[in-house]
């Protein structure tokens, strides 16, 4: 049995990452490959296809034995990559990642931007490299590192989609289409989650899940002067607040429906305490609070449970609210 040389493995992975993966991630950042939910013209724009082309071109440069690559695109659906690396040991592993991106947003630091790769020390700034462009590169390099030392490995497959940020609506069709090619994985590795620090490998055991929706409140067919209409016509903003208050306690942030909550077991609390023992105050202090803003809980265990196990309402956007410089004395229609 070949013994793994950890020092050599680390040196090889670091070299491959710096010399091969990072230059590609720079190019990946430059592609505004918004997920279909944020780009209705994604097919015509071709940015998702560009990420597919970029990654498959990189794969062609990697001396990985037993590698086969297939790009799938069903009619009207986003493209998907399916790779297979033949195993030299029993077992099957499935790696998952995605190449589509969230919208670019605003507020980037001076000299940085969503489609402009900037490296400062160990940090690479730009949209999508962490969520989730790195995933395929990291997985492929990990298998290559084993081959480089002659270490037997199981058959490894990689499924890389381009609509995850839209809720993966196209993925089920591809899972059915590629069923015979996906095998029967003994282990699924999803390289698309967070971590506590850079000193150890973190495993995500559970995600809270997400229910997304759009709340619309309309009160009039056209804008009317607020001085004339307020007090007679209801405020769409007030109605929205009332509806949100059915769901969320505005004083505490706690969500009201019982069905959104789970019982926090003693085991979960004990696990959370162990994590807090490792990470300490960084659990809270790593967030960019403004001066005077306090965390909702200063108890580390309670903060961790709230972050990972308790439901929360997050409002991520609003329409129908004019910018301040355009907000005249007009009652909003919606």
Model-derived regions: residue spans:
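Short connector loops/turns at beta-strand edges and beta->alpha or beta->beta junctions
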Residues: 30, 34, 115-117, 216-222
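A structural supersecondary motif
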Residues: 303-329
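Flexible loop/turn segments at secondary-structure boundaries
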Residues: 37, 79, 101-103, 165-168, ...
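Short, internal active-site loops enriched in acidic
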Residues: 34, 75-77, 162-166, 263-265, ...
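Fold-level recognition of mixed alpha/beta catalytic cores in primary-metabolism enzymes, strongest
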Residues: 129-298, 302-313
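Active-site metal-coordination/substrate-binding segment of hydrolases
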Residues: 90-160
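N-terminal helical capping/dimerization or prosegment-like subdomains
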Residues: 2-107, 333-334
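Short, solvent-exposed beta-strand/turn "edge" segments of beta-rich domains on protein surfaces
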Residues: 232-233, 326-334
């Amino acid at each position: 049995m070949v013994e793994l040389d950890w020092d050599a493995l680390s040196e090889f992975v670091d070299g491959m990452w710096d010399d091969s993966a990072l230059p590609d991630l720079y190019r990946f950042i430059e592609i505004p490959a918004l997920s279909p939910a944020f780009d209705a013209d994604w097919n015509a724009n071709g940015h998702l296809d560009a990420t597919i082309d970029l990654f498959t071109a990189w794969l062609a440069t990697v001396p990985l034995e037993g590698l086969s690559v297939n790009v799938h695109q069903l009619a009207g659906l986003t493209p998907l990559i399916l790779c297979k690396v033949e195993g030299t040991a029993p077992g099957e592993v499935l790696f998952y990642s995605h190449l589509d991106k969230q919208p670019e947003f605003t507020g980037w630091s001076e000299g940085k931007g969503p489609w402009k790769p900037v490296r400062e020390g160990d940090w690479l700034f730009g949209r999508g490299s962490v969520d989730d462009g790195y995933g395929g590169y990291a997985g492929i390099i990990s298998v290559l590192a084993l081959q480089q030392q002659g270490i037997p490995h199981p058959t490894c497959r990689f499924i890389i989609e381009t609509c995850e940020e839209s809720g993966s609506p196209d993925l089920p069709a591809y899972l059915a289409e590629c069923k015979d090619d996906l095998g029967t994985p003994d282990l699924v590795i999803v390289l698309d989650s967070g971590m506590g620090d850079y000193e150890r490998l973190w495993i995500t055991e559970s995600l809270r899940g997400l229910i997304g929706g759009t709340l619309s409140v309309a009160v009039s067919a056209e804008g009317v002067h607020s001085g004339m209409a307020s007090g007679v016509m209801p405020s769409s903003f007030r109605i929205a607040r009332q509806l949100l208050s059915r769901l969320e306690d505005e004083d505490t942030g706690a969500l009201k429906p019982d069905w959104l909550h789970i019982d926090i077991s003693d085991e979960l609390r004990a696990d959370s305490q162990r994590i807090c023992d490792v990470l300490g105050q960084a659990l809270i202090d790593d967030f960019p609070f403004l001066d005077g803003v306090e965390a909702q809980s200063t108890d580390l265990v309670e903060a961790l449970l709230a972050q990972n196990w308790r439901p929360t309402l997050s409002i991520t956007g609003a329409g129908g609210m004019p910018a301040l410089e355009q907000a005249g004395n007009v009652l909003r229609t919606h």
